[in-house]
């Protein structure tokens, strides 16, 4: 059998075995997107979290999704909703009840990450929240989300924010 040159390993052009597969951050981004939709549904329809999770797993392809992270967000946000909302209120110019439900879902998800997932840098949390608001929110919703999260991050991650401003 004659070997094809293209099959040989070329150290100048290394191709990892997982080339073409989504990265961990890409899988988490997809988990956040689905979790935002699921949290919106939970807020609007008041279905049980287990029902919503089961529906999302049937209706969506989880191949490129961090399923464990999706589940952690979906069950984690409602578990500390009171703490999340209490943290959000001082950073907002309008009442929670008046907020667009999509933006509320994004802000709750992002606040949960700031509180519970200190392994995720605050700048990543803010960026992901803004991107979610661009995808799902109203025309300028991302600007509102950015403003709220910019105020919230120093309150919840004071040391990390100060260290990054040096």
Swiss-Prot record:
Residues 1-28 are annotated as: Disordered. One of its GO terms (molecular function) is RNA binding. Residues 1-18 have a biased composition (Basic and acidic residues). InterPro entries: NusB-like_sf (IPR035926), NusB_fam (IPR011605), NusB_RsmB_TIM44 (IPR006027). One of its GO terms (biological process) is transcription antitermination. The keyword tRNA processing does not apply. NCBIfam families: nusB (TIGR01951). This is Transcription antitermination protein NusB.
